[in-house]
Amino acid sequence: QMAVSYSREELGRGISLTRIYDKKFKSNCVKIAFISPLDEKTACVNAMLQTVLVTSNAEIPSRTKLTSTLTGLYGSSIGTNCGTIGDYQSVGLSASFIGDDYTIDGEVISVQVVRQLLNCLIRPHLVEGKFCEKYFTLRKQELIDAIVATVNDKRGYALLQAKKVIFEGEPAAVSAIGTVELAENITQEDLLRQHKKLLESA
């Protein structure tokens, strides 16, 4: 029987650290999640914001180079998390990487991967005070495509419609990624404002 350890520590008001350890796994996953009340426009902005943040950062302002750097660290990756929990939305960033015990000569890659994860969150790639326009446009179109794709996913679409009926008039009825119209109207200012708000109060 494998021993699984679990601990949860309060680091500050509204901030907690959860550790789950199971020695049967050879890889690690670090997730940073922001929980905030569900609101259709905010949910849409959050859904796009997280994808823009993981594209690059101030230290590595190139999407290709960031991907290459992580791949060079034993196939590590940085991604996003987006979903709903009742009347709340959970969005954030995550990093997956092999455990340091399994690298060649015990190379410590965990610190390097988590450094880039934190860079993406706290030191985003800004050009003259705004997110890189190229990546902004790219991620906006990807979000629109994802929203459109939900209509073609019969099971997912049916679940979304059921939620709208069951939770009519309640935050839980809202989609975790918003609508095409809302996505099309997201501005740079929306992302910058929401990024600041998440760090300060989510």
Q: What are these model-derived regions, one by one?
A:
Residues 52-55, 73, 116, 120-124, ...:
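Structured segments of extracytoplasmic/periplasmic soluble domains
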Residues 79-83, 148, 192-194:
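Catalytic micro-motifs at enzyme active sites that drive phosphoryl/nucleotidyl and oxygen chemistry
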Residues 26-44, 64-119, 156-178, 202:
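M16 family metallopeptidases and their MPP-like homologs
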Residues 151-154:
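Charge/polar-rich, low-complexity and marginally structured segments
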Residues 67, 123-147:
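Acidic/histidine-enriched alpha-helical segments
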Residues 3-6, 161-201:
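Histidine-acidic residue clusters that define the catalytic metal-binding segment
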Residues 56-59, 101-104, 123-133:
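Short, polar/flexible loop-turn hinges at active-site or ligand-entry regions and domain interfaces
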